[in-house]
Amino acid sequence: METLQGLLLWLLLSMGGAQASREPLRPLCRPINATLAAEKEACPVCVTVNTTICAGYCPTMMRVLQAVLPPVPQVVCNYREVRFESIRLPGCPPGVDPMVSVPVALSCRCALCRRSTSDCGGPKDHPLTCDDPNLQASSSSKDPPPSPPSPSRLLEPAGTPFLPQ
């Protein structure tokens, strides 16, 4: 009887009854749709903009003997190529530049976190939504993403060149 049960178990397992998926468990680093908030202190309107950002999983390692060996540098999902699109904020008073630059991720990669261009974790200094929801206006022709993730933010002036690492 035990031989028969063992044979049946072997047969089920060998036919793919317990087969691992070839897909990664977490989505890897790639451009994804996201909604960002664009606002200026002097302008009375906050505009939400649909764009692409870099997000996803990057393989990392941690040393077992942390006290003896130096830490292993951790990589995060970073922009490889990015372009900036200018958005005009409506209702800005005269003398205030109504243009805001928004990043559009063209490609991404796993690399060391660059604080100059990425949100490396820790306290958030810029909200991902408008400060005052009553002032919110929408400015986008694309369909909104299914759910806004916690993105790396990359808001720089349009004239600032971006050089990939």
UniProtKB/Swiss-Prot annotation:
Q: Which UniProt keywords apply?
A: Disulfide bond, Glycoprotein, Hormone, Secreted, Signal
Give the signal peptide as a residue range, or say none if absent. Answer: 1-20
Q: Where is this region: Disordered?
A: 131-165
Expressed in which tissues: Placenta.
- InterPro entries noted in UniProt: Cystine-knot_cytokine (IPR029034), Glyco_hormone_CN (IPR006208), Gonadotropin_bsu (IPR001545), Gonadotropin_bsu_CS (IPR018245)
Quote the Pfam families the UniProt record gives.
Answer: Cys_knot
Under the GO molecular function aspect, what terms does this record hold? hormone activity
Where is it localised?
Secreted
Q: Which GO terms describe its cellular component?
A: cytoplasm; extracellular space
Where in the sequence does glycosylation occur per the annotation?
Answer: 33, 50, 141, 147, 152
Q: Does the keyword Translocase apply?
A: no
- State the oligomer form and interacting partners: Heterodimer of a common alpha chain and a unique beta chain which confers biological specificity to thyrotropin, lutropin, follitropin and gonadotropin.
Share any extra remarks.
There are at least five copies of CG-related genes and at least two of these are expressed in the baboon placenta.
The name this protein goes by in its record: Choriogonadotropin subunit beta
Organism listed in the record: Papio anubis (Olive baboon)
